[in-house]
């Protein structure tokens, strides 16, 4: 059963402009986890495209959750990583994890599916939260 669907677009050029400012470090540390920041060096895409896709993924996730960034959810509660095959995945903690748990029907497990894409100047994220019977 589908619990929620969310999608978001982020303009890569907007992130490029932000990264060019001297206060960009504050922006990056506020929106992205240490793991995400560290991983940004390992990808061949530009840092702006890397961060734009992850920003879009976080926005898409809270839309799928049905809350947006209300209820004290922070960007740090949502971290985007890649599995061993390179597929993106959503990792949640804090208030985001608590709110997701409230959405889970009894005797079900939850899965978060994430798809990312970019075609300059746009980065796209699509999230589906699914509940499956145990």
From Swiss-Prot:
Per UniProt, which keywords does this protein have? Cytoplasm, Fatty acid biosynthesis, Fatty acid metabolism, Lipid biosynthesis, Lipid metabolism, Magnesium, Metal-binding, Transferase
What's the Enzyme Commission number for this chain?
2.7.8.7
Which InterPro entries does the UniProt record give?
4-PPantetheinyl_Trfase_dom (IPR008278), 4-PPantetheinyl_Trfase_dom_sf (IPR037143), ACPS (IPR002582), Ppantetheine-prot_Trfase_dom (IPR004568)
Report the catalytic activity.
apo-[ACP] + CoA = holo-[ACP] + adenosine 3',5'-bisphosphate + H(+)
> Carries keyword Zinc?
no
Q: What's an example of a GO molecular-function annotation for this chain?
A: holo-[acyl-carrier-protein] synthase activity
Q: State the Gene Ontology BP annotations.
A: fatty acid biosynthetic process
- Give the location in the cell: Cytoplasm
Family per similarity comment: Belongs to the P-Pant transferase superfamily. AcpS family.
| NCBIfam families assigned | acpS (TIGR00516), pantethn_trn (TIGR00556)
Q: What does this protein do?
A: Transfers the 4'-phosphopantetheine moiety from coenzyme A to a Ser of acyl-carrier-protein.
Protein name as catalogued = Holo-[acyl-carrier-protein] synthase
Which organism is this protein's natural source? Zymomonas mobilis subsp. mobilis (strain ATCC 31821 / ZM4 / CP4)
Q: Which gene name belongs to this protein?
A: acpS
């Amino acid at each position: 059963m589908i619990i929620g669907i969310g999608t978001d677009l982020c303009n890569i050029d907007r992130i490029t402009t932000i990264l060019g400012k001297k206060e960009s470090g504050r922006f990056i540390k506020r929106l992205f986890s240490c793991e995400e920041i560290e991983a940004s060096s390992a990808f061949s895409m530009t840092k702006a495209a890397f961060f734009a896709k992850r920003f879009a993924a976080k926005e898409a996730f809270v839309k799928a959750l049905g809350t947006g960034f209300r209820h004290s959810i922070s960007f740090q509660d949502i971290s985007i990583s890649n599995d061993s095959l390179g597929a993106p995945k959503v990792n949640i903690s804090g208030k985001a994890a608590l709110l997701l748990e409230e959405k889970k029907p009894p005797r079900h497990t939850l899965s978060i599916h994430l798809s990312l894409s970019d075609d300059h100047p746009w980065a796209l994220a699509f999230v589906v939260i699914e509940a499956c019977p145990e």
